Regions:
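Long, contiguous hydrophobic alpha-helical segments, chiefly transmembrane helices and signal peptides
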Residues: 8, 20-22, 82-83, 93
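A short glycine-rich, Lys/Arg-flanked "PGG" loop and its adjoining helix->strand segment in the class I
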Residues: 2-17
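Conserved Class I S-adenosyl-L-methionine
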Residues: 65-138
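Conserved class I S-adenosyl-L-methionine
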Residues: 17-51
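Localized chelating/binding microdomains
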Residues: 36, 61, 73
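Acceptor-substrate binding/catalytic loop of class I
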Residues: 41-58, 75-81, 97-102
């Protein structure tokens, strides 16, 4: 990672911006949503990515200590995925490493979705916290 930051420093213009966007190492929240209101939620544990985040944090700290970049700002946000069924969520998760490793109870989610919809249009919303940080090249 330090090599990647060194290369970013090399190619950035003076005072150019380095953007670091990654998920927070925290449980995802899966909700049953009707209209815009969550009517039920559960947390899904996923420790995949914790080592990646730690390595990235270490590399960033090294780059800051070498004064390659100056921290500018940090902005937390939620990334949300909407699915009509638990099977749709399962198909999406198969394509993404961090979600693939999460212990998502698909069958239980589908049962809960059917129970709570009661004829209304209900969807699953998977919400994960992310951080966008920016650093300026010195």
């Amino acid at each position: 990672m330090v090599d990647a930051l060194r290369e970013a420093r090399r190619v950035l213009t003076p005072r150019g911006i380095l953007v670091d966007v990654r998920p927070v190492t925290a449980p995802m929240v899966v909700e049953v949503v009707i209209a815009t209101r969550a009517i039920w939620a559960t947390e899904v544990s996923s420790s995949v990515g914790a080592e990646d985040n730690a390595a990235a944090d270490t590399a960033i700290q090294y780059a800051l200590s070498c004064e390659w970049f100056v921290f500018e700002k940090r902005h937390p946000f939620n990334f949300e995925i909407y699915c009509d069924t638990a099977e749709d969520l399962k198909l999406y998760a198969r394509m993404h490493r961090r979600m693939r490793a999460a212990e998502i109870p698909y069958e239980a989610l589908e049962v809960r979705l059917c129970e709570l919809s009661a004829g209304r249009t209900a969807r699953l919303r998977c919400r994960r916290s992310w951080i966008l940080s920016s650093y300026r090249k010195k």
